[in-house]
Amino acid sequence: MIPDTEIQTALPALGQGNTAVITGAASGIGLAAAKRLALMGMKIVLADIGGPRLDDASRAVAAIAGDDAVLAVASDVSKADEVDRLADRAFGAFGDVSLLMNNAGVGDNPGKPWDNRDGWKRLLDINFWGIVHGVEAFTPRMLASAKPGLIVNTGSKQGITTPPGNLAYNVSKAGVKTFTEGLAHALRNEPGARLSAHLLIPGFTYTGLTEGATEKPAGAWTGEQVIDFMLESLVRGDFYILCPDNEAARPLDEKRMAWAIGDIIENRPALSRWHPDHKDAFAAFMKG
């Protein structure tokens, strides 16, 4: 693990006394980020749906950073006005914001696109539009500060390889990937290029709510491992923060992604990895 002093030297945005805003902060990766950044001396704004989990998370982070350095804001990221209000609260309480982690998301499976319009809309409103709302609300003021800043949007490997099973989730995370790529390009063309965007791509991560599991599966990483890897990647200047886990190392992910883009290049059927006519070819490709 990289020492905090080395991280903060490489990334002034994460310096002591600076402010991080984290959505989806009441549990999982978001809460792990809040605790880790609090240990680094940052002020923390935790945003999540209001309730006991957010209250508990706020107390846990305040035990590290102190009550005066923590602000909890009940916020539904699917609603632009609530994210605007979150930004007003964050800037009002702490002045500048130097890190925005758009991490809130849900893993609901609304099924086929032709039988559950409301379910699809809810998932996309949270997973995709929630990130757009965060960027809209915070970016202008982060740019105006003329200070170093970071925006980290949480995507998913499912937004890249798009496996069958939860099409709506895949669509939402594919949108996050494309949006964040374009955001990074736009920001690096701003005068001074002091604000950058990055795509966090977690692997199999145990959050305490993972598929109903009460104990961490052997193949999963913890949220804390994801955040340590994220910080190491940011120090390197990575845009794609492609996290491994205890089941899938990076070379395995790379081959799966290469096969997915190969569907276009080789003119194979969509999602050929799961097509019976290409099952053997995929297996041979993975072994090669």
Label every model-predicted segment.
Residues 19, 26-28:
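Conserved glycine-rich cofactor-binding loop
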Residues 40-57:
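Conserved glycine-rich Rossmann-like NAD(P)H-binding loop of the short-chain dehydrogenase/reductase
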Residues 51-52, 74-85, 117:
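The beta1-alpha1 cofactor-binding region of Rossmann-like NAD(H)/NADP(H)-dependent oxidoreductases
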Residues 84, 107-121, 165:
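Conserved mid-core segment of classical short-chain dehydrogenase/reductases
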Residues 156:
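Residue(s) in the substrate-gating loop at a strand-loop-helix junction
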Residues 185-250, 261:
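SDR active-site lid
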